[in-house]
Amino acid sequence: MANEFYALISRMRYITRWGLMRNSFSEKVQEHSHMAAVLAHGLALIRRDILGLPGPDPDRCAAAGLYHDASEILTGDLPTPVKYFNPEIKKAYKQVERVSGDKLLSMLPEALQPSYEHLIQEDDPETLPIVKAADKLSAYIKCVEELKAGNQEFESAARQTMQAMEAMGRPELDYFLREFLPAFSLNLDQLE
């Protein structure tokens, strides 16, 4: 059998997020994963270099961000309201994600599987909190961009996502929200 892992990973570009929402512009899982990786790397650097707190390696956080939604290649993107509708559905979906992750890992040569396991299965206790924060932050940035484009459909999602981020109690995330997030509301001319 051919090693199909990377061919499947490349298909993240076809999976659309926010499927239940009217979007001004679509966002694919690949785009979201890239932004989550950038943000996870940045949050880990803020934690270490600005706040002086211990934490995971920023490069490991970036890699984990790239693969955090890889299981969606096989499952598709299940909308958040469905995914978290009740504890039973949440638990069942976690199991589906685990099985999908196992399937992806099986498509790698055995020698590579241990290096990818924590990235695909999101079970590294060091990087997971940073990646979860980056994932929420990426979702919030999408909401900001949609609201900036006049799409009020994202108003509730923005509010709920901000509340979830504030509840995380992550100082590096709080720093980012205070110091970097306001720039996402600017237009191109204002950014220069």
Residue ranges and their predicted role:
Residues M1-E192:
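Alpha-helical, largely C-terminal catalytic domains
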